[in-house]
From Swiss-Prot:
Broad class of the protein's primary localization: membrane
UniProt superkingdom: Bacteria
EC number: 5.2.1.8
Residue ranges of every copy of the PpiC domain listed in the record: 136-232
Listed name of the protein: Foldase protein PrsA
Gene name tied to this protein: prsA
Length: 296
């Protein structure tokens, strides 16, 4: 399962003491390594510069938007990811060199940046109408996955005799090859049009079902043949009832647009009155500010 990490930060907090008697970071038979030596080495690396860039951005974002990002919001998103990955959550963090604490900080950084994008985005009615065409409400479905089309057709025929959800769950447990959902009657987590994990053909079929109905033809994807049952589908309704959701989806799409993020970050940093005191690092924000941030 691919993970789209929220913000390109390492999750490392670096604190350097530059006093004359610099603290020792490590000792070896060949001598000691001091914080100032470590700093001098790290600041020359791309990863070291990237960490400083992110630390500066986080400081500025916290001052401007910190009050808009509560611990509750951070924990809600954290728990969503934790639930998504289940028992593999800890190993996913480890594979990405992250701790639970640093991941929460990454989530917070992303939410702060999102607030900045909101603040610097004027959503037009034309954009809302365009997003409405793509919009689908959050639906909940169950599916039965099999390898042969004929098996899927046999299952559909059984459902035509008894199309209840109870019968569907029995059939899922008996026939489905999806081991992660079959014991729960094939039930999947709710999703809407912004979902990127499911096959587009599968989603189109699911969105087209009325609540309590099932697909009368097998739905083919790269995984095999699906029979889909709609557990919950509130219907699309009217655009005026979903303005808030549409705006949120537009902002989310801008969070994936590098040009938008470049523009927003540039505005935030310029407003933040950033001053780089180390002459060797004065150009690390030049791609955002257009010139070096010299010592003042």
């Amino acid at each position: 399962m691919k993970k789209k990490w929220l913000v390109a930060i390492s999750g490392i907090v670096l604190t350097f003491g530059l006093a004359a008697c610099s603290k020792t970071v490590a000792t070896t038979s060949g001598g000691k390594i001091t914080e100032s030596e470590y700093y001098s080495s790290m600041k020359k690396t791309s990863s070291g510069k990237q960490v400083l860039q992110q630390m500066i951005l986080n400081k500025v974002l916290e001052k401007e938007y910190g009050s808009k990002v509560s611990d509750k919001k951070v924990n809600e998103q954290y728990n969503t990811y934790k639930k998504q990955y289940g028992s593999s959550f800890d190993s996913v963090l480890a594979q990405n060199d992250m701790t639970k604490s640093s991941f929460k900080q990454e989530i917070r950084s992303n939410l702060l940046l999102k607030e900045a994008v909101k603040d610097n985005t004027k959503i037009t009615n034309k954009q809302l109408k365009a997003q409405w065409k793509e919009y689908e409400p959050k639906v909940t479905v169950a599916h039965i996955l099999v390898s042969k089309k004929s098996t899927a057709e046999d299952i559909i025929n059984k459902l035509k005799e008894d199309g209840s959800y109870a019968n569907f769950k029995k059939l899922a447990k008996k026939y489905s090859t999806d081991s992660s959902t079959k014991n729960d009657g094939g039930k999947l987590a709710a999703f809407d049009n912004t979902d990127t994990s499911l096959d587009s053909t599968f989603k189109k079929a699911a969105f087209g079902l009325k609540q309590g109905s099932f697909t009368t033809e097998p739905v083919k994807t790269e995984y095999g043949y699906h029979v889909i049952y709609s557990i919950k589908n509130p219907g699309k309704g009217k655009m005026s009832d979903h303005t808030s959701e549409l705006k949120s989806q537009i902002i989310d799409s801008k969070m994936s647009d590098s040009t938008t993020l470049q523009t927003v970050v540039s505005k935030v940093l310029k407003k933040g009155n950033v001053s780089i005191k180390d002459k060797d690092l004065q150009n690390i924000l030049s791609s955002y500010l257009g010139s070096s941030s010299s010592s003042k």
